[in-house]
């Protein structure tokens, strides 16, 4: 039996402040080692959404500065209903670094400005001088009814991760 993983990489051209595109490369390599085919589509500003959310296994979004996250957040608002339905129907979103903030109810940047949010995750974020950084090891065995998934182990440095609300 062969497996396929459909990934949508969102805004990696501008949300890649700490080399977050490496997360996608790592996932793809791990899939290759396991004989899992990866189908990748990319989406960014001023691009047509040329994919169906029902066909997506994983959405990946990297991190950026407050300024770029504000720009992306405004663009993401166009996809709010689709993204909320995706999450509510057990879709998986890997938000790296500060990109999780855009999915919350409130996000105040370092200047205290309220950035428009998708209001999908029940979180409020206020930027502060001191940040939490360090290594995290996550083991996750997602038991989707339609697929059998492997243990996914990800080493992350300097990033917050939220996979599901």
Stretch-by-stretch model annotation:
Residues 1-81, 85:
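N-terminal beta1-alpha1 cap of cysteine-dependent amidohydrolase-like domains
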Residues 66-142:
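Cysteine-nucleophile active-site neighborhood
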Residues 27, 40, 59-61, 103, ...:
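Generic structural hydrophobic/aromatic packing signal, biased to beta-strands
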Residues 40-42, 120, 149:
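Conserved beta-strand scaffold positions in the cores of enzyme catalytic domains, especially
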């Amino acid at each position: 039996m062969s497996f396929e993983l459909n990934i949508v990489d969102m805004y990696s051209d501008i949300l890649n402040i700490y080399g977050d595109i490496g997360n996608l490369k790592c996932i793809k390599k791990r899939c290759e080692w396991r004989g899992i085919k990866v189908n990748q589509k990319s989406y960014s500003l001023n691009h047509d959404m040329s994919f169906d959310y029902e066909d997506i296994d994983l959405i990946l979004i990297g991190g950026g500065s407050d300024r770029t996250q504000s720009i992306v957040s405004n663009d993401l608002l166009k996809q709010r209903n689709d993204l909320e339905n995706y999450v509510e129907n057990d879709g998986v979103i890997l938000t790296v670094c500060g990109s999780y903030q855009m999915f919350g109810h409130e996000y105040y940047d370092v200047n205290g400005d309220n950035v428009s949010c998708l209001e999908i995750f029940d979180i409020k974020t206020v930027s502060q001088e001191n940040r939490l950084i360090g290594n995290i090891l996550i083991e996750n065995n997602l038991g989707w009814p339609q697929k059998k998934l492997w243990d996914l182990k990800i080493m992350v440095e300097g990033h917050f991760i939220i996979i599901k609300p």
